[in-house]
Amino acid sequence: MKRKILATLLTVVMATSLLAGCGSKADAPAASGSGDAAASGEVQEITWMFWDDLNATEDLISKGYADVIDRFNAEYEGQYHVTPITTNLEEYYPKLNALVASGDVPDVFIVSPGPNLTDYVEPGVAAPLDDYLADGWKDTFTSDAVFSQQTYDGKIYAVPLNIAAACCFYNTEMFEAAGAKVPTNWSEMLDACEKLQAAGYTPITISAGTAWCLSMVAGYLCESKGVDLAAIADGSGTWEDGKLEAAATDLVELSKYFQETAAGDTNDVATANFYNEEAAILIQGSWAIGQINGENPDFESKCGVFQFPGVERVIAKSDSLAMSSTTECPEACIALMKMFTDDTAQKYTAEVGGKIPVTKVEYDANVAPAQLAYVMDVFSGAKGTFGFYNESMPSTEAGAHFDDDMVAVYLGDMTPAEAASDMEAFYAENCR
């Protein structure tokens, strides 16, 4: 298996492990510096990297994270101080990898479970957290199961912040006006889109410019066809058994109901099309509730949710925090991570942000966004969960290859059969 990014990271981390750490407040904020701050009584500086602009965002989850940063700096004034490093989602991992390569590993950074986290665990960039969780912190979480995707060889390398599910948002008023019913299977999905289009509405808004958005839909379609990722990875299965080809064919069929600008639209633009009532359906996830309600609070009353039709399981994921293995301020980092999972932050997660908390915190469902209750209904009716397809493959490179192939199929640059053949060739060379 070729893991070029892992080899690069491992080389860099081994060469620069002594450079990372925290600095005193007199120093310029950075992820590296002297460990003398704790002994001298100076303020310990740490950094936290995140995939949104905390100053400009209207996303309610991001606003909640900004509140955590403010609370942390106020509560630990004179002891610890955290400086955020922010960027947009599309540029997040390239910029994080650049910091790793330069030796300036952020002390704490957000990461998605799966191959993305693996890329920081295997080279030793992320630190195991078990010793810190053992002080009673772990007992505040709902169960050990919330750490399943963050655990490697029995050790936990990241802490989940929330749980979200991929789902379909829909404009209830548009559905009613078009005489469309909420679909429960694939034929009903196509029928609803046909009625919406006939009524003059754009049925679906989606981003192919942000490739994972389109590949998430492809992942659901693969699930509906019975694609077995584990068997394909170990060589007992193949991408060329007809299942991916059938899923990609359905993707092409569904794409005739996408907005005309889907090929170039980013995730943010596609989501805005929905809450600005320019399209009837947004295939996204409950992580978008904070963005939808933050940008257009009046839209909440007409925003319904249904499970992607034709599948029994739902895609679930969590935002997670990892700590640099070379930080010289682990106590400050853990204090920050604990604040992200304290009762104040977790209540906000549900009552304002519309995501599912990962701790045993009690929250008022009556004040939470209406969409959260709909998402909980989807969860309760599902027979299980699975991960994003591009985050469930042997490597980030394999996931990116799947993303690119699905976009190519949508654009007409590759047939479904060619995509299946291309994925099989990639796995044969890189993953087995």
Predicted feature residues:
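Extracytoplasmic/periplasmic substrate-recognition and gating elements
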Residues: 44, 71-78, 177-178, 249, ...
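Conserved N-terminal structural module of periplasmic/extracytoplasmic solute-binding proteins
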Residues: 7, 23-118, 122, 182, ...
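Extracytoplasmic/periplasmic solute-binding protein
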Residues: 153, 157-161, 166, 190-236, ...
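Glycine-centered hinge/linker elements that transmit conformational signals in sensory
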Residues: 193-196, 234-263
